[in-house]
Swiss-Prot record:
The gene is Decr1. The modification N6-acetyllysine is found at K42, K49, K97, K106, K244, K260, K315, K319. It catalyses: a (2E,4E)-dienoyl-CoA + NADPH + H(+) = a 4,5-saturated-(3E)-enoyl-CoA + NADP(+); a (2E,4Z)-dienoyl-CoA + NADPH + H(+) = a 4,5-saturated-(3E)-enoyl-CoA + NADP(+); (2E,4E)-hexadienoyl-CoA + NADPH + H(+) = (3E)-hexenoyl-CoA + NADP(+). Substrate binds at R91, R119, F149, R251. One of its GO terms (molecular function) is NADPH binding. This is 2,4-dienoyl-CoA reductase [(3E)-enoyl-CoA-producing], mitochondrial. One of its GO terms (biological process) is fatty acid beta-oxidation. It holds the Pfam family adh_short_C2. NADP(+) binds at G66, G67, G68, T69, G70, L71, R91, D117, K214, P240, G241, P242, I243. The keyword Membrane does not apply. Keywords: Acetylation, Fatty acid metabolism, Lipid metabolism, Mitochondrion, NADP, Oxidoreductase, Phosphoprotein, Transit peptide. The active site is at Y199 (proton acceptor). Its main location: mitochondrion. Homotetramer.
Length: 335
């Protein structure tokens, strides 16, 4: 699940036997506290600053859909901090302009805001022309615009299905193809990045439209990685696990009921932060990753492998119970 949000780390050092609550998130539908059930999180503290050199994107242009909030805003902030001239797009121009001004005032680099509904191919066409006019052909293209909600599939309407697939699959295709054609015409390469989800590969109940659309996005990017490398373009994918944002959690966990369950199935013992994902995104879009093409990077603290293992729930077995189990196993004769 791409659940992205603004992170706030205020952990207090304690003895290993009593890590105590650590506040990681102060924004969202519900404040999350790390519990004593996940003391291992102290070994996996998030690094919230950019890892690349400050000039890694100097002279480069980055285009980010869904760039006004959440993960899109975080990636834009990191790219701008590292020298890129950024162009952000979404439907809400007021939010975009506020984000552009906020980031530009911090980094000193230009951030342009363009209103675009990625579901509308004509609007995407005009947006790409404006992008090229104000900033030039992009070196980085991040398809981050998304939509999702939870629902039993038998309750879905055609409009519910269409709402998600139009944004996620069709919108990504319109943006990618429109920019790609312009780049081919200009004989210019670029790094494309798609933000999907860990269940794009496995499928998931109750988010069937999103799962289907994200799976299509991954197939599209892998196909273009094979086809358009000859034009200097490469395509990679990040599958985020649970990362908290107000926008995502308000639709996927509106009561805050499932946060602890999420942490319980993440071996690293905490949710991810948007800064960590922004670091991964900037690396994949940088020249340092010029030989990475067609890759799918799972970014979930180990959640997927935990859920895949038949016996991983045995972590709840106590030492005393293991002593009993071992004794019973040793007494077993034959096959």
């Amino acid at each position: 699940m791409a659940l992205l949000g603004r992170a706030f780390f205020a952990g207090v050092s304690r003895l290993p036997c009593d890590p105590g609550p650590q506040r990681f998130f102060s924004f969202g539908t519900k404040t999350l506290y790390q519990s004593k059930d996940a003391p291992q999180s102290k070994f996996f503290q998030p690094v919230l600053k950019p890892m690349l050199p400050p000039d890694a994107f100097q002279g480069k242009v980055a285009f980010i859909t869904g760039g006004g909030t959440g993960l899109g805003k975080a990636m834009t902030t990191f790219l701008s901090t590292l020298g890129a001239q950024c162009v952000i797009a979404s439907r809400n121009i007021d939010v975009l302009k506020a984000t552009a001004e906020e980031i530009s005032s911090k980094t000193g680099n230009k951030v342009h805001a363009i209103r675009c509904d990625v579901r509308d191919p004509d609007m995407v066409h005009n947006t790409v022309l404006e992008l090229i006019k104000v900033a030039g052909h992009p070196d980085v293209v991040i398809n981050n615009a998304a939509g999702n909600f939870i629902s039993p599939s038998e309750r879905l309407t055609p409009n519910g299905w269409k709402t998600i697939t139009d944004i996620v699959l069709n919108g990504t295709a319109y943006v990618t193809l429109e920019i790609g054609k312009q780049l081919i015409k200009a004989q210019k390469g670029a790094a494309f990045l798609a933000i999907t989800t860990i269940y794009a590969e496995s499928g998931s109940g109750f988010v069937m439209p999103s799962s289907s659309a994200k799976s299509g996005v991954e197939a599209m990017n892998k196909s273009l990685a094979a086809e358009w490398g000859r034009y200097g373009m490469r395509f990679n994918i990040i599958q985020p696990g649970p990362i908290k944002t107000k926008g995502a959690f308000s639709r996927l966990d509106p009561t805050g009921r499932f946060e602890k369950e999420m942490i319980d199935r993440i071996p690293c013992g905490r949710l991810g932060t948007m800064e960590e994902l922004a670091n991964l995104a900037t690396f994949l879009c940088s020249d340092y990753a010029s030989w990475i093409n067609g890759a799918v990077i799972r970014f979930d603290g180990g959640e997927e492998v935990f859920l895949s293992g038949e016996f991983n729930s045995l972590k709840k077995v106590t030492k005393e119970e293991w002593d009993i189990i071992e004794g019973l196993i040793r007494k077993t004769k034959g096959s």
